[in-house]
Amino acid sequence: MLYGLRLYAFQEISFLDPWQLAAIFSGSCVLFISLEKRTLTGYMLTFILYSVLALFVSVWLSSAAGKAGIPIEGMVFLLFLIGGICFICLIQKIFQLTPNTVQALIPILFSALFFFLEELPALEGLPLLKWLKGLDLLLLLVGLLLLIFNENRQGGDGEGS
C-alpha cells in the first residue's frame, strides 16, 4: 500500500510557495463561509482571514505596486468584497430576508467576485486563473441550489401544517 502511495506525483503539489498556501487557505475560507450558516463572529473572522490572504496573494503575484506596496488590483478586489458584503446586509435589511436566503447569496457574491477577478490584467497567464473559472461556476451552482432548496423548504412548511 505504501508503494502505491509513492506512485502519486506529490512533487506537483508544492506547498513551498507562499502564494499557493495562501490561495489554498483563502479557497477553504470561501467554502467555509459558503456552505453553512455561521454566526456573525464566524463570518467576520473568516472574511478578515480571507481578505488578508487574498491581499497577500495579490501582493505576491503583482510586479507593479501601488500605494504602500499594495497593487491597485488588490485594492479593487478588497473594495469589491467589502461592497458586496455591505450590499448583502442592505438587501437583508430592506427585504427582511431569512438567514437561509442570505446564506444562499454569499456563494453568489463570491461567484461574481471571481468572475470579476478573471478580468484583471494582473492574473493573465497564471495557472490560478483556470481554478478561478471552475470555482466561479461551482459557487454559482451552490448558491442557486441553496436558493431553490430554501424556497422549497419554506413552501413545504406552510402546506403540511
Curated annotation (Swiss-Prot):
Q: What GO cellular component term, any one, is given?
A: mitochondrial membrane
Keywords, comma-separated and alphabetical: Membrane, Mitochondrion, Transmembrane, Transmembrane helix
Name the domain of life this protein comes from.
Eukaryota
Kindly list the residue ranges recorded as spanning the membrane.
Answer: 13-33, 40-60, 70-90, 104-124, 129-149
Q: Where in the cell is it found?
A: Mitochondrion membrane
Kindly give the membrane topology term recorded for this protein: Multi-pass membrane protein
Q: What else is known?
A: A stretch of 270 kb of the mitochondrial genome is duplicated within the centromere of chromosome 2 resulting in the duplication of the gene. The expression of this duplicated gene (At2g07719) is not demonstrated.
The protein's name: Uncharacterized mitochondrial protein AtMg00610
The root-end lineage is: Eukaryota, Viridiplantae, Streptophyta, Embryophyta, Tracheophyta
